[in-house]
Each structure stands twice: as C-alpha cells, then as structure tokens.
Amino acid sequence: MKKHTENTVKTGLWCLAGGAVIAAILMPFFHFDFDWREPLLSEVNADITVLGFCAALASLLYFLVTAVFAFFYRETPQQQNSELPKCSVIVPAFNEGEYVLTTLRSVMNSNYPSDKLEIIAVNDGSSDDTWDWIQRGANEFPGRIRTLNLLQNGGKRRALYEGFQIASGEIAVTVDSDSAITENAIRALVAPFQRPEVGAVAGNIRVSNCDEGFIPKIMEAAFGFGFEMIRCAQSFIGSVLCTPGALSAYRLSAIRPLLDDWVNQTFMGRPSGIGEDRAITSMIL
C-alpha cells in the first residue's frame, strides 16, 4: 500500500512538472495583445483568453480530483490458496516469435496454485515461427499449457474469443504475448472478484525497458498516470472505463453472454479491428 501511495504522489509530481515545462515552452508562442481601439479584435482575444482559462481550470480540477480519489484507493486483500477460484490465462499471439515463450514462462512462474491455473496459448494465424515457440512452451511444461492454432489471422479480438470459448475457469486473465507478468500479478487481479458485483479488473501495465532511452521514459510516465492515478481513481468510485488489453481479468459468467456481439462488432459497416478492450469493458458496464 505504501508503494502505491508513493507511486501516486511521484506520478502526480511528474505530471505537474511536465505540464509546467510544456507551458513554459509554449508561452512565447502565444501573445494576447488587447487593443481596445479595435472592438472586434479585443472581443475575440478576450473570448480566447476566457476559454483558455476555463480549459486550464477544468484540467486542474480534473487532475486534483483524480489525484485525491487515487490517493484513497485501496487494494483488495488477497485470498488464501483454498479460497482462490480457478483461473484461465489466455495469451493471444500473432507474429511474436520467440518472445511468446518469455510470456508463457512468466505465467508459469506465477505463485497462483497450479491446480487452479489453466494456460491457453492461441496462435492467431502467424506467418512466422510463433506457433513453433508456443509448442516449445507446451513441451517445456507438459500438461500445463493448452494450445490453439488458428490457421487464418482473424485479429486479437477473434483470438481472445476462441480462448474465452474453451476456457474452463471462473476467471479469465488476458496477457499480451509481448508482455511478462510478475509472479503475484494473477493473485492481485483475481482478488477484487471476491465481490460479486465485480465483472472485470484492470491490470497495472508498466514499461520494462524504461531506462533504455527517452521514449520508454515518456511511455512509463504516461502509463504511470494512466494506471497509478486514472484507473485507481476510477476504481475508487467503482467504474473503470477501460481494462487494458495487455493485462486484464474478467468474470467469465459476465462476459460469455456478450461475446458474440463483441466479436462481431462493426464500425461504419466494417469489422472493428481495434479497441477490443474498451469495447468489452463498456459492454460489461
């Protein structure tokens, strides 16, 4: 809990500092020179100033409210092994190559009880050697990993759909094939499902190579704000608006009635190729 509080404060300070730096950089490019001898121009400038002030004030209030809610967020205590439900971990993979094995190994290193953990690896019609690496993972952990080979690439939504259909657990956890989870991640994700009204839980996504350059650091700051603050604040009020595709958990009894509509979702008459995480979250809500 102390670590969460520290991360929340750290993320907030970084966001404030970043906003101040950006404002300082942009300030010279904005000049509001009010010439009251030109009524029309002065009215436009005044309107822009008022709108800008209102937008800045609204952003500040949003940030402060989010920070307060996130500060008071508390993680759900984890259960004893005997109380844990059966969990199905679904790993969809497309042209991920060797890294899918890293993902599978990280799942296998979980401290979740092995007799309550089902791993399903789905090859989404990859054109490289991803399927070979999935099979290698299954051979490395005999009887522990179920494999599904889709001959045609149908997209992540279709791969997850097929995994959900054969999952036998009470809870389904989705993990991207370019990610690695910590050993305690599944237990932490499953804990909130002790409350029957919970239909989905968002994982906490971080950048593993944030020390290797400027871009990873920027991504880490964005992820920190998104997960340590925004989603914590949303969880505090009981309504997370998007469970991230890289790591999330779902109550299968809540999503199974929604799956056909979800997998066949269209946008402007065409099949939806992205946004599967936000779509299923909205359906659950």
Per-region residue spans from a language model:
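N-terminal membrane-anchoring/stem segments of glycan-assembly enzymes
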Residues: 1-83
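Non-transmembrane catalytic domains and loops of membrane-associated enzymes and transporters
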Residues: 81-285
